[in-house]
Amino acid sequence: MVSFFKTPIIIFFFLLCLNEKVLCSINENENLGENKNENANVNTPENLNKLLNEYDNIEQLKSMIGNDELHKNLTILEKLILESLEKDKLKYPLLKQGTEQLIDISKFNKKNITDADDETYIIPTVQSSFHDIVKYEHLIKEQSIEIYNSDISDKIKKKIFIVRTLKTIKLMLIPLNSYKQNNDLKSALEELNNVFTNKEAQKESSPIGDHGTFFRKLLTHVRTIKENEDIENKGETLILGDNKIDVMNSNDFFFTTNSNVKFMENLDDITNEYGLGLINHLGPHLIALGHFVVLKLALKNYKNYFEAKNIKFFSWQKILEFSMSDRFKVLDMMCNHESVYYSEKKRRKTYLKVDRSSTSMECNILEYLLHYFNKYQLEIIKTTQDTDFDLHGMMEHKYIKDYFFSFMCNDPKECIIYHTNQFKKEANEENTFPEQEEPNRQISAFNLYLNYYYFMKRYSSYGTKKTLYVHLLNLTGLLNHDTRAYVTSLYLPGYYNAVEMSFTDDKEFSTLFESLIQCIEKCHSDQARQISKDSNLLNNITKCDLCKGAFLYANMKFDEVPSMLQKFYVYLTKGLKIQKVSSLIKTLDIYQDYSNFLSHDINWYTFLFLFRLTSFKEIANKNVAEAMYLNIKDEDTFNKTIVTNYWYPSPIKKYYTLYVRKHIPNNLVDELEKLMKSGTLEKMKKSLTFLVHVNSFLQLDFFHQLNEPPLGLPRSYPLSLVLEHKFKEWMDSSPAGFYFSNYQNPYIRKDLHDKVLSQKFEPPKMNQWNKVLKSLIECAYDMYFEQRHVKNLYKYHNIYNINNKLMLMRDSIDLYKNNFDDVLFFADIFNMRKYMTATPVYKKVKDRVYHTLHSITGNSVNFYKYGIIYGFKVNKEILKEVVDELYSIYNFNTDIFTDTSFLQTVYLLFRRIEETYRTQRRDDKISVNNVFFMNVANNYSKLNKEEREIEIHNSMASRYYAKTMFAAFQMLFSTMLSNNVDNLDKAYGLSENIQVATSTSAFLTFAYVYNGSIMDSVTNSLLPPYAKKPITQLKYGKTFVFSNYFMLASKMYDMLNYKNLSLLCEYQAVASANFYSAKKVGQFLGRKFLPITTYFLVMRISWTHAFTTGSHLITYFDPPNTNPSTLPNCASGKNKSPESFFFTHALAAEASKYLFFYFFTNLYLDAYKSFPGGFGPAIKEQTQHVQEQTYERKPSVHSFNRNFFMELANGFMYAFCFFAISQMYAYFENINFYITSNFRFLDRYYGVFNKYFINYAIIKLKEITSDLLIKYEREAYLNMKKYGYLGEVIAARLSPKDKIMNYLHETNDDVMSNLRRYDMENAFKNKMVTYVDDFAFFDDCGKNEQFLNERCDYCPVIEEVEETELFTTTGDKNTNETTEIKKQTSTYIDTEKMNEADSADSDDEKDFDTPDNELMIARFH
């Protein structure tokens, strides 16, 4: 018990621990996608309020404008920027004539370019004000435009970025310096506000004159264009006007304005007039803009935040420190929303449910910034999956930091990442810092000088991974409240580029512009307010101010020079030849746009930001945040095209695809080649490597009868048949719960049922199925190489003269073994007559007619026995590069290609590549080499190993490169094209759906079907139509090939970082492939019963009419009235009986007969429930000692076998029984037969319904009928088995004793073998070891039966004897006397005690000369 004085201490520590947990819980739940809160119990309103109340509003404001650490770091960065501007190689801006009129030279330093040159350039100083830097930025842009060329492009970008950063720093230092001098928070905020209200040169007149008149004329002009029917492209006319602008020079493209400072000042003025000055000067930088919008909120609501304190206030840095979902909760508190975001639902859904019409523009902008900062964070984390380490969005911020430094520095402690081997290995760069064995941990990873140095020195040359590491380093600092990271973020391009993520809607640029026009129309009709004339932070900015200001900012011109909007539109439509901004954005990385054209002028990002805020579809009627979330809602809908929609009817898709391919213009493939990079064709060739030659597989498959069987063994079956049988066996085993348990030992299945009963769980090894097939394939090849003639050629002769075919066999199996984990098998139809021109025409016509009849009356399942099966591997890195480039080409040319036409154009391109491999193929189609694909070099066996591998690849690529490569390409392309894959991957990552992936009947679960049925996605979306032929038409190997389709999909999903979908395909490779094959076989036969089903349907309709009206609809079915008394009233058809439609007992007698047969067929089909191997094999186990005189049964596959017909009979008995009882149920099944089963979408959902409802009723029926008898049979079988084991054990324990006693009493020297002592012991020992014992004990043994539970593991057991009967040993072996003993001795002999008592008796050397039989008897006694 705790003493009294210790109690307060314990309570104190308990409270500390509780507080620690509460503080950590705020970061516990990361919000994926759209910030879904996964753990509502942790972040309850009570817990969150308790935590947030700890933060004082004034302290939070002080952290922004009274923070000494922030002030110090900003000052340090300012000095670093000023120093770098002085030492910059780009000595601009130059001091020219008229420059002094633009800026105050006294606040700048003048520097000569060289000592011998009179030209001077100016650099700002610490005394330069914010307005001075604004003018300085105008000068730099003016002169950069004039001198621009590609050689100095990176230098210009770098200078523009750091000057913009310097301007931001100057603005951030204004309230910090003011508070430091006056120690007054409000006056510091007012000092910041004065920057935008007390402009030095305030213009009295607007650049566009009267605003009302301007917009009135604009709307009249827009209305005129829309009403003019002669104008075809109205959207382009609205943007470009009457002037047709051609592609401009690079400097016109790269900069938003021309080299005119006055025009730049006019842009500043126009944004200032609409209250957008803050956005104009800062740009859409996520950190900087958010910082000042929060300060603007602080000034506007100063009384509520800091005097009354009835609303919570948080600094921008503190908001970013929270988890993704909690950031919105904090924002709701700051914006005084009545409904604070505490829901588990997505932020979009909860935001749109509440009336947000009164929300201020500042809160709308913060909503936008937080939403895309969350997306930026997730994008950075997602991109790490392309590297050697993975992060995930659910990680707490501390763990993200630790995980990052553990990866970069091999230690969670901070280090300078630029000095680590992980960073250096991305490229060979010269390191200007001294080499160190261990990363320097004395200097912080967020050191301002080091990060700025490497940014200026190396950033422009960084690749994707290094740029990612730099931004991820800064992100970890922001998430963990590091002020230095907060300051460093000001110059990182990724925080500007995040605006690009908002252009995800698949709409043309002109359509987005029309939304902006609609916003202006709505504002002009609703109100006519006067503009503010400045960007006073106290002013309320409305949506109308935003729309009008954005329009003017984007459309202002100077001297007939195109506006920003026109430049950007021309760049898209004529430069890049695309119509959608999203097509451009999808090809860019959001954290490294430093290398694209937008980085030449940061105002491009400002233009995109303002244009995005005002171009949402519903912006005219909703505020910015509502319009943004409504736009995202549209993006969430599945992009259902003919390529991506897996429910699209496959016959229509097939014929449409073939039609598009046939009508593709001849020059379209040439155009695609021109759009590709020079080395892409070579990459395409290297994307696949063929390993298992088709002729190699055919030797074990189609030509298996020609192979010599091993001595004493039957001839082997075709390899594809063996593989198909293994899949069928797995399917038969799965319902009994033995799915992939002990896959390496197929004979252990008999014991599994007992393990289940004994609760010894055996976990399934579902991802190991390929190893089973490997053993079967290797066994088939080994048997081939064991043939006598193969041994003579391959093993006993010089390999130099070996047959080409044998060498090809050996190379194929070696390549398969060496690349086992990566090998995939595809197949094609093997129709030999099709490839031989000598085939008579009538035979070809006959085959075609037979195929047509076979397909029309069902489907084409099992039409061919064998297929052409070959193995290959995918070079994932190269293929990913190829697909990324082609996908980018498609996005940039959607005006030329549709998704289907682009796919078929790529297929034709692959056909061209395939033709380049055909140099060694003969021209005549009748050639046997071409028919069986033995088109390798004539001297193939004499080549070295590397050359032979190339021959195999070229041989297979000459026929199957296009089909195989296109299958892999379409998988990746259609996945990237769909906007549903991200959500699908997240759905299968949820705990409730993880079990679907490992389920053996996932195809019958609602989640599997609702989330897209990966089986249908593979067959109807991810793969081309021709890929369905082998998985349907082949009798042997179709399931094996389909499982490899799943494995290819798994690899493709893994390449795109969809880990959950990758695992789903891997785990469902067997179960779903088996289901598909079985479904096709059942569908084929089911459709053959169409005439019979139709006949009974017509008869049923007639009887239904008789039940309802009293007379038959068709008189043929009216029973004769010869003896009406023998027929029930309802059956005679003369009386109405409407209730018989639901249930009738009139045919109960007939139904009972069918129920009887249904019951007995269930006994046969459901025997696996209690007998894992079936009832027959279970009985045979009792006669294993009798050799079975029968032939080996042919392995079963998915076809019409005995079980199939038993199931068919079972189905007939079920139908005849229950259809006769209830006509309503019969009609329900008719609807399924005629409609549901013929539409894949309906059939999949009906399968789920059938499982949970109809099958449930059938299971309950079986439980009270056939299952009872099966259980009784199982119990009886076990009792018989136990009784048999009992007899065996008794006999096994008595047998050695009987033999010894027989030896003792019935010894015949003439017959007895004269065995020596040790031979006899070994003989008895072996006998004891081999009998069946299993350490069983007998219960309720009588006194005379106790010996049954006694065992001796080291010596034989003898009968209980009287001591008087013991034998005595004498020197004469023929004289044996017995002596009576009155007392019994134990039958168990303790050999250890015996050795201790008399070691002489156990000495073999001493007794060596004694006869063996006498020595043995003496040893027993």
UniProtKB/Swiss-Prot annotation:
Q: Does this UniProt record's set of keywords contain Repeat?
A: no
Top-level taxon of the source organism = Eukaryota
Q: Which UniProt keywords apply?
A: Cytoplasmic vesicle, Disulfide bond, Host cell membrane, Host cytoplasm, Host membrane, Membrane, Signal, Transmembrane, Transmembrane helix, Transport
Pfam families, per this entry? Answer: CLAG (PF03805)
GO cellular component assignments:
cytoplasmic vesicle; host cell plasma membrane; membrane; rhoptry; symbiont-containing vacuole membrane
Cleaved signal peptide residues: 1-24
Please list where the region (Disordered) is annotated. Answer: 1371-1413
Q: List, as start-end ranges, the regions of compositional bias called Acidic residues.
A: 1398-1412
Task: Name the membrane topology term.
Answer: Single-pass membrane protein; Peripheral membrane protein
Transmembrane stretches, by residue range?
Answer: 1203-1223
Localization of this protein: Host cell membrane; Parasitophorous vacuole membrane; Host cytoplasm; Cytoplasmic vesicle, Secretory vesicle, Rhoptry
SS bonds (residue pairs): 335-363, 409-415, 519-547, 523-544, 1352-1355
A Gene Ontology annotation in the biological process aspect, one of them, is: adhesion of symbiont to microvasculature
Q: What does this protein do?
A: Participates in the formation of new permeability pathways in Plasmodium-infected erythrocytes enabling the uptake of nutrients from the blood plasma.
The entry describes its oligomerization and partners as: Component of the RhopH complex. RhopH complex is at least composed of CLAG3.1/CLAG3.2, RhopH2 and RhopH3 with a 1:1:1 subunit stoichiometry. CLAG3.1/CLAG3.2 mediates subunit association through independent contacts with RhopH2 and RhopH3, which do not directly interact with one another. Interacts with RhopH2. Interacts with RhopH3.
Beyond the main fields, what else does the record say?
Many Plasmodium falciparum strains have two highly similar paralogous genes, CLAG3.1 and CLAG3.2, that are mutually exclusively expressed. Analysis of blood specimens from 20 Plasmodium falciparum-infected symptomatic patients indicates that parasites predominantly express CLAG3.2 in natural malaria infections. CLAG3.1 is preferentially expressed in cultured parasites. CLAG3.1/CLAG3.2 expression patterns can change under different environment conditions.
Protein's name in the database:
Cytoadherence-linked asexual protein 3.2
In which organism is this protein found? Plasmodium falciparum
